[in-house]
Every structure is written in structure tokens, then in C-alpha cells.
């Protein structure tokens, strides 16, 4: 069902992409396209909430941008608070008056996990506040099982999409121009 939603909304794209991690791929998942349609956002959020419910989450936190809407929808179905972390001078922060209490059970959610970099930053941020990060959830896991957050990781869909280091990218070697649709802007 999730893959069909991604295809129907145009969220599953083909081309030459530079991922937020700096790696390259011939496939990209732009979940913002999925969230153009609130009915699909609700389906995805509810399904992810079902997977995370067993962790007794009090607060759901998503990294901006990919986790902002997702954290809200998942939190709604979990009857939890929803926060998002965003970069300030390249560092993930809780801003806008957001806070977590020491011991608060938090879930970190992200639309797509490839290397898990943003999620790991949010986990560290929450630990600095004393939160108890109990799980991570994503719509799509494209990590190939290579990411370890130190807490359970639940995803709605595992996609084995090609990922290349820039120096080994066959698309670059073919001279195909790359798009950079991600939001981190670090690489």
C-alpha cells in the first residue's frame, strides 16, 4: 500500500540525485509529494503510529524538513506531543520554545532514512535534554539494514534503491547532471 501511494503521488522519482547524505542515487523518494495529499499523509502517519504505539511514546520529534509533518500526524494518532528540530548554524536545535523533559519518552521520526545522519543528530539533541529516546520510525528505510540508532527502528517500507559514493557514481561517469532535492544543504 505504501509503495502504491508513493507511486501515485509522484514521490518515487527516477533520475540522478544527490541525497542529503551526499551520496548519489538513480532513485529518490520525495515524501513532500506524498504530503501534498492530506489523505495519504493521514494513512502513512496512522500506519507508522501503529508500529510505534508499543513504545508508549509521549513526544514525537522529527528533523526539519522531512520529519515536520510526519511527526505531527504520528503524534496525533499516538495522542502525544509533536515537536521538530531544525538546524541553526548547521547544528540541530529545538527552537520556537520547544523542550523535552528529562525522562520523557520520545520517538524520532523521519520520512526517509538512508544513512540516518539527521535522526542521529536529533537523538543526541534529545539526550542532551535528558529525554529517553525509545524508538525511531520512518516511512521508508533505504539504509539496507546498515543503520543502527541504538533503539528499535520501525519503518513502513524498506526500499533497496541504489546508492553510490560520489567518486563511484556511474551516473556521474556517464556525465548525467545531478539534482539535489534534499533539504540539509550540508554537502
Curated annotation (Swiss-Prot):
It holds the Pfam family Pribosyltran. It catalyses: orotidine 5'-phosphate + diphosphate = orotate + 5-phospho-alpha-D-ribose 1-diphosphate. It is an enzyme of class 2 (transferase). Pathway: Pyrimidine metabolism; UMP biosynthesis via de novo pathway; UMP from orotate: step 1/2. The lineage of its organism: Bacteria, Thermotogati, Thermotogota, Thermotogae, Thermotogales. It comes from Thermotoga petrophila (strain ATCC BAA-488 / DSM 13995 / JCM 10881 / RKU-1). Orotate binds at residues 114, 142. GO terms for molecular function: magnesium ion binding; orotate phosphoribosyltransferase activity. Catalyzes the transfer of a ribosyl phosphate group from 5-phosphoribose 1-diphosphate to orotate, leading to the formation of orotidine monophosphate (OMP). CDD domains: PRTases_typeI. This is Orotate phosphoribosyltransferase. GO terms for biological process: 'de novo' UMP biosynthetic process; pyrimidine nucleobase biosynthetic process.
